[in-house]
Amino acid sequence: MARAVGIDLGTTNSVVSVLEGGEPTVITNAEGARTTPSVVAFAKNGEVLVGEVAKRQAVTNVDRTIRSVKRHMGTDWKIDLDGKSFNPQQMSAFILQKLKRDAESYLGEKVTDAVITVPAYFNDSERQATKEAGEIAGLNVLRIVNEPTAAALAYGLDKDDQTILVFDLGGGTFDVSLLEIGDGVVEVKATNGDNHLGGDDWDQRVVDYLVKQFANGHGVDLSKDKMALQRLREAAEKAKIELSSSTETTINLPYITASAEGPLHLDEKLTRSQFQQLTADLLDRCKTPFHNVIKDAGIQLSEIDHVVLVGGSTRMPAVAELVKELTGGQEANKGVNPDEVVAIGASLQAGVLKGEVKDVLLLDVTPLSLGIETKGGIMTKLIERNTTIPTKRSEIFTTAEDNQPSVQIQVYQGEREIAAYNKKLGMFELTGLPPAPRGVPQIEVAFDIDANGIMHVAAKDLGTGKEQKMTVTGGSSLPKDEVNRMREEAEKYAEEDHARREAAESRNQGEQLVYQTEKFLKDNEDKVPADVKTEVETAVGELKEKLKGEDSAEIRTATEKVAAVSQKLGQAMYANAQAEGAAPGADAPGDAQAKADDDVVDAEIVDDEKDTKGGAA
């Protein structure tokens, strides 16, 4: 059986690992290194260079060297070279092809199956793009796995009942995840992150600082010189790495550029303290995702058994100190190599999928809630955020109008209670509903998220069996900044949303009661005394009038009045029945009806018993 590899496709570096005798091994590349730079270059003769060789020639071939392509995954970014257009999937595929070749050379056999990792906060389009890159590279992508989850899998395989915090700061992305490990099960409890925060940003701050210092000293703007900028980037990365182990470094770049007076040289000292001041706000951006994860998981800091640092950027002393401070003084686990742990976890997951690793179950999560818009503009969640995937959830909804021929299913992603404030992923219509009173049709809406985090939605009329489906793909997933904005807004406007939801529910209850009471009066016209009928009709008329306005308190009061006077209908019916010596007749709204009305909320989701509750239109 062909072996499957685990690939950590990183922003700055990539790693490939394989199981040998059940133990994960990091594969050494053709250059003798265990990590491969995620750099692609096109030589002047048209040859495609990947990895260390591409990185080495970058200064003299700036325009034809592409790095950090992971930051463009899932976007419409393109680069034109030699009359050809390349997208991020193709660029990533060049890197994956090299990793595939190195693995084949090491193993002495063909490699086709792979598990590829992505940041936990990658959205649908970014995951799709990663999968496509693997396919372009000739790989059969068995699974897309979240990086922190893979790290925990690598770390926690032989551990019992522990809670692990994974702090993953790579070259271009940042994730925090909280996982529980026990009895061979690795379960993600919560995850959060920032897809545009990583070591590249720290490098850029040093580049900006050097450009400013050089402009002040020589009056020349190096940011306009592509070749000089490339040298600055490499020097900044080197300085950052040196400052992790020493308190001061010198950046010396002779012949960086030239002026009318002749060649100019850059010679700058940079202390660790200066570096930390330049990047203090980047460090601050790591705090919010951390706090969100602790809050979402609903645990105390004292309950965290181990802290695992992942990604080369966690080697920066300021980052390690921040993690220690955030976790209440806990020392991070030093038993894992932050550069390799994700690939090791990916190879273990590949082993699980191929049946080589037994008794391990990996339970990943979806980072945002998913639902549909229901009557009153409410967001009715079918799948809550941090739900384990793969998952399938279905609920029964109904129509809001008599003889409604179709229902619109509008799919949203986010945490706000009002649908319009969330991210709309798409919509479709279920048509051809047979004529029926409102509340009668039963429409089953099903959400299905597969193990790769890709979503499918279906709506089915249980009466006719008609079904409509939709797959959420491409650019429909959420960008990182939208996710963060939604989370912050959800907390900020929680009270306002709650009030709006209550108002919508009050209106729905009022409309439902008007409909039921009028129908009852019509069906039992000859059995209701005139005075009772007049009193009920007056109360219903008042409620209808209030429903034209926006005052939810008045609507609630009028609804309660109708519920109270409608009890007289039941009393009158039973009195008539007893007078005639007959058994009680038709059901009256009465207490039972009023109570039912309290339960009937058009936007509410329903249990597996298939009770009809919400209006889906």
Swiss-Prot record:
Q: Which Gene3D superfamilies match?
A: 1.20.1270.10, 3.30.420.40, Actin, Chain A, domain 4, Substrate Binding Domain Of DNAk, Chain A, domain 1
Q: Where is the composition biased (Acidic residues)?
A: 599-609
Span-the-membrane segments of this chain are none
User: What's a single GO MF annotation on this record?
Assistant: ATP-dependent protein folding chaperone
Composition bias, Basic and acidic residues: 489-505
Source domain of life: Bacteria
Protein species of origin: Streptomyces griseus subsp. griseus (strain JCM 4626 / CBS 651.72 / NBRC 13350 / KCC S-0626 / ISP 5235)
Q: What induces it?
A: By stress conditions e.g. heat shock.
Query: Could you tell me the keywords of this UniProt record?
Result: ATP-binding, Chaperone, Nucleotide-binding, Phosphoprotein, Stress response
What ranges does the record list as Low complexity composition bias? 579-593
Segments of this protein annotated with the region Disordered = 489-512, 579-617
Enumerate the InterPro entries for this protein: ATPase_NBD, Chaperone_DnaK, Heat_shock_70_CS, HSP70_C_sf, HSP70_peptide-bd_sf, Hsp_70_fam
Task of the protein: Acts as a chaperone.
Q: Which gene encodes it?
A: dnaK
On whether Phosphoprotein is a keyword of this UniProt record, the answer is yes
This one is known as Chaperone protein DnaK
Write down the HAMAP family for this protein, in alphabetical order: DnaK
- Where Phosphothreonine occurs, residue numbers? 173
One protein family per Pfam: HSP70
The positions making up the signal sequence are: none
Protein family per UniProt:
Belongs to the heat shock protein 70 family.
What NCBIfam families does the record tag this protein with?
PRK00290.1, prok_dnaK
